[in-house]
Amino acid sequence: MNQDQLKQLVGQKAVEYIQDGMQVGLGTGSTVKFMVDALGERVKNEHLNIVGVSTSDRTAAQAKALGIPMKSVDEVDHLDLTIDGADEIADDFQGVKGGGAALLFEKIVAINSDKVMWIVDESKMVHQLGAFGLPVEVIPYGSQHVFEKMAARGYNPVFRKVNDELVRTDSNNIIIDLHIDPITDPHALAEDLIHMVGVVEHGLFLDMVNTVIVGHANGPEVIEARP
């Protein structure tokens, strides 16, 4: 199985957990795209009555095109389940997210969810976080000073660019990717980053995920990370 087939596998498995009447957070990224496709099929074929809440403009556009009823996060009192991808998941089920530059909205939706599920192919399961760059969302104003503070701490920051243009988030902020390998104390790092003036949010998703579905060639593995 290639990587896309593994992603499709876990996406299809994840939608089995969505029940009639649920308010569901829809993540962002290549794996989630397969999940949203599968959810659209269930809505169409089973007349599944659910409401989706998106973590990005591109997921919202995909869901609407598939006929999935959508609301904004501020229009729902809670979310029953959020299904999202992850860039890295460590042995203790701490995660790094934000490769798709949607980490702020993803975290807002996740913390307002009763349950959080991450769907990944097996390459995303690691012993310790850090090989994947850690995304940090910062406001543009003063971002060079934030960058220099990060560099002084030894975080090896890099402004994220595509075609020599700064990547912009859906909130029009920018992303600084940190290269800290390994991340030995993610909780301490998270505290340090969130207290830097100009930092909006970081891509450490700690003590948050309940269920992880991992795509293997022999089928999806469902792991209960925490109650």
Curated annotation (Swiss-Prot):
Pathway: Carbohydrate degradation; pentose phosphate pathway; D-ribose 5-phosphate from D-ribulose 5-phosphate (non-oxidative stage): step 1/1
Family matches, as SUPFAM superfamilies: D-ribose-5-phosphate isomerase (RpiA), lid domain, NagB/RpiA/CoA transferase-like
Single annotated GO MF: ribose-5-phosphate isomerase activity
CDD domains: RPI_A
Positions of substrate binding: T28, G29, S30, T31, D84, G85, A86, D87, K97, G98, G99, G100, K124
InterPro entries reported in the protein's UniProt record: NagB/RpiA_transferase-like, Ribose-5P_isomerase, Ribose5P_isomerase_typA_subgr, Ribose5P_isomerase_type_A
Entry annotation: catalytic residues: E106 (proton acceptor)
EC number per UniProt: 5.3.1.6
Gene3D superfamilies named among the record's database cross-references: 3.30.70.260, 3.40.50.1360
Catalytic activity: aldehydo-D-ribose 5-phosphate = D-ribulose 5-phosphate
Keyword field: Isomerase
Oligomer status and interactors: Homodimer.
PANTHER family (UniProt xref): RIBOSE-5-PHOSPHATE ISOMERASE 3, CHLOROPLASTIC-RELATED
Function (record text): Catalyzes the reversible conversion of ribose-5-phosphate to ribulose 5-phosphate.
Record's protein name: Ribose-5-phosphate isomerase A
Organism: Lactiplantibacillus plantarum (strain ATCC BAA-793 / NCIMB 8826 / WCFS1) (Lactobacillus plantarum)
